[in-house]
Amino acid sequence: MQHYRLSRRALLARLMTGAAMIGGSANLPARLRAMTAAGIRLTNGPLVLEFDPAMRSRLSIDGLALTAFEPGEALRLVDGRVIDRFIMVDHRDQPTFGPHGPGRRHTLRATADRVEQRLTVTLFDRYPGLALMALAYRNTGAAPLAIAGWHAAMHDLLSHPKGAWSFAGASYPDRRDWIQPVVAGFQQANYMGMNGSDYGGGTPVAVAWRPDAGIAVGHVDTVPRLVSLPVSTQPTGTRLGLSSDQPTTLSPGATLTLPTTMIMVHRGDHFRPLDSYRRVMAERGLAAPEVPQASYAPIWCAWGYERNFTTAQILATLPKAKSLGLEWAVLDDGWQTSEGDWAVDRTKFPRGDADMKAFADAIRAQGMKPRLWFSPLAADPGTALLRDHPDMLLLDRDGAAQNVSWWDSFMLCPAFPPVVEHYKAQIRRIIGDWGFEGLKLDGQHLNGVAPCYNPAHHHARPEESIERLQDFWKALYDQAVAINPQAVIEICPCGDSFAFHNIPAMNNTPASDPTSSWQVRLKGKTFKALMGPSAPFTGDHVELSDRHDDFASTYGIGAIPSTKFTWPRDNDHPLDKRPPGGYVLTPQKEALWGKWIALYRAQMLSQGDYLGGLYDIGFDKPEGHAIAKDGRLHFAFYADHWDGPIELRGLSRGRYTLTDSFTRQPLGTASAAAPNLNAWFDHYLLVEATPLEGTA
């Protein structure tokens, strides 16, 4: 173990600016003088992480500098000062072994005026390019230290002539793309708390990448934290890191411990760092559950009839849905009288519970599986639930309820045990009594909540509501699968960037109200990283896609098809604006829908191995995706129009015969030595590559 130490007396004599410190290092012990002159250089595969004597750091990948030396860690004080220059006084290096396997732990101790910084950097053999950083600050002065905020792992990815792209895991009311080009003036705070009354939470990772390399930063705590992961353009490149604006006062001798930070250098887009993040979090106890086969079944949803459906309309559509190869029938919003009470609407189901059970049985009688829409944690004003249990509400520091805008309702606190028990009882009713085999848990408010100050809840801290939201969802999931181990639990946080910490409580997720086919694809790629390469991701209703029929964007990324067509006619009085022609399944649509669903069922690419590292979704043109399944490679390319060569990546030895997956037309052959295919297409091209026998 290496260990260098500077005495406190020698340190205080040099407690000046970084330049003065370096200039005065001649009187230090020889080994420490070498350390302060050259700093510390840590390596892990392609990653090189360097710290200079002032604790400024630089990131490199395979010898290529991605950042300059800069103060990646800093404290902001209430009086306006920023502490971002420290004197490194101690470095310890020792082997370590834990849930992430073997590695080396480096502990760096540094000091500035009245503050000691302790940074532990751990590098793991199984995660080349990645480091975990644990950072703490101790007040070494005699007076309290008023802190306004901090940042960690903050770096500027140096600019590239072709620019940069970014992934951000925060949620916003405008339902923006999770992946965006970093253009001039780009700035996004990526606050992981609430960015709207009912939009918040997400995946606490930010990624910025150039065509040749990128940087990812996130935290790996197993509960959500109220931090930001800002991404912005800077004169020299793209800045990203982890930060907080939560003020705190540090008493003399007290320590501020920050969330454990992940930093990674990588090639390609955001897929590899998110895949590494998933594996790290699984080793820390946060992983997706086992997936039942039914999670991959294609879906028909009754939402085309909207809330004012009739049961006769739905039941009459089931034979058509079944004939197309669809296996799930989802009863959407409108079966209930209100959010909160969840009483059955007796204008549609006159016998209440008995009719709900009979309805689920009728779906099964048609050879399909019944799934029910449900929106926990929202309660409408005037409901019996809020009349009898006002203590269930999540309240802010002023005693006001959190608004759920979509349903004009109020948020209940997921950390209050009576709320958990209320919804577990609803699950027992839906899955156990009525016999539905799946749940569609829907609403942007599902993703994140605000801190709760309701005095009736006796929270140790207001943030308990945030940290225990994942426990609420897991309690509902466990209740459902205890009744039916094959139950499909879908969480659809409409338009949000999905909250990673909720993943253990679901075994299916959709594109959650995509605004474009591009969103279907970028969300699909992201989920295949966050849940695994065979994650059961649904493309959401195809009617939401470009041209209202873009099954190709679902099929090509290994997603599950879903549709909300009506038949033989639409509702006479729609509540929302419909696309031209409405949702009715015309004979032309029926032929197209049937062909795509049959292709999905024949190939089942959703259960294949999504090869997210082969193509860069930002820089590669045309946009490319690849899936390995049953010895074949399935490629998907997307562009408004393309005329030129396409590279088929990931081919092994030997030759492959190429076929258009949709038309079944031959496209020639290719090999790893000659992987290019000259192609002309509008919107999409799907290519199936089959190894030729005897050419390996």
Regions from the language model: what does each represent?
Residues G325-F537:
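Aromatic- and carboxylate-enriched substrate-binding clefts and catalytic-loop regions
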Residues A37-E50, M55, L59-V231, T659-P666:
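Polysaccharide-binding surfaces and accessory modules of carbohydrate-active proteins
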Residues P46, T248-R267, W680-E688:
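Short Pro-Gly-centered flexible turn/kink motifs
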Residues S276-W328, D332, Q336:
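An acidic-aromatic substrate-binding cleft motif
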Residues F51, A254, L258, W473-Q665, ...:
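Active-site-proximal substrate-binding groove within the catalytic cores of carbohydrate-active enzymes
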Residues A38, T236-T249:
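Short acidic, Pro/Gly- and aromatic-enriched capping/linker segments at domain boundaries
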Residues T669-A696:
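C-terminal beta-strand-rich structural cap/linker in extracellular carbohydrate-active enzymes
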Residues Q2-Y4, A10-R31:
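N-terminal export signals
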